[in-house]
Amino acid sequence: MAASFDEINQQWLIRFLEHRIGDRRIIRLIQKWLKAGVMEDGLVTVSDRGTGQGSVISPLLANIYLHYALDLWAVRWRQREATGDLIFVRYADDFIVGFQHESDARRFLNEMRERLWKFALSLHPEKTRLIEFGRFAAERRERRGLGQPETFNFLGFTFICGKTRAGKFQIKRKTRADRMRAKLKMIKAEMWRRMHQPIPKQGQWLHYVVRGYFNYHAVPTNGRVLHVFRHHVIDLWRRTLRRRSQKDRMTWARMTQLANDWLPKPTILHPWPSDRFAVTHPRWEPYAGKPHVRLCVQ
């Protein structure tokens, strides 16, 4: 969505909160948070819109607002309007919606724009797309001469229509290339600042950074990207160590040993989505009888 934190209607937000909170003291406290304003260059600006992005409570209030403005409406639309299967996934103000039928996708998109407009929200024009995606997308697009299925980005990953080694359809998740470049750029700048620290201290910091990166990105089908990321980190570390001394004694053999001592190796840490879902929904059969899915992406 486009600038949802800044456009939230505060009157609607209070009404949503009053639906579940009966204690007027809590409501008044939240109203004070909303009216606290934002300080920029010494000037306090108070607005009757938005939740003040950056505030501790802003993400919570925005999530409550979107729950009533979008989530409940989407569930009701699926129950009453959809002619096929519909999948809705939202994280903060980013969401994707999957449809069995293209006609449902187009109707949902048009009606969702009207729904959001009622609550002072709108879709981001550059990030909102309607694409053909799923197990039959490649075959159908090839028949129409349209090339490979489009990809989409969600929560730091690029989702791709792929195949297993056995030739079966598989949704592949890869770390977004631009996000990885940005992370490596941050590491490079920080290593420059830490150039003259002892090697163990540098290694400890890099260990935490790489471990944290793997904790999020170590999903199935993303293993190669993890190896590439680790290789780039090793190279950045080697370049840093070479710059701090005129006598270049940092060979790749020694660098490899340092990396093995300090940097975690790439390992897939997260289960397949279908396996995770089956734990909480044991009677669910992944992809059972489901045709291809088209996605409306935000």
Go through the PLM ranges and name each one:
Residues M1-Q298:
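Non-catalytic terminal/accessory segments
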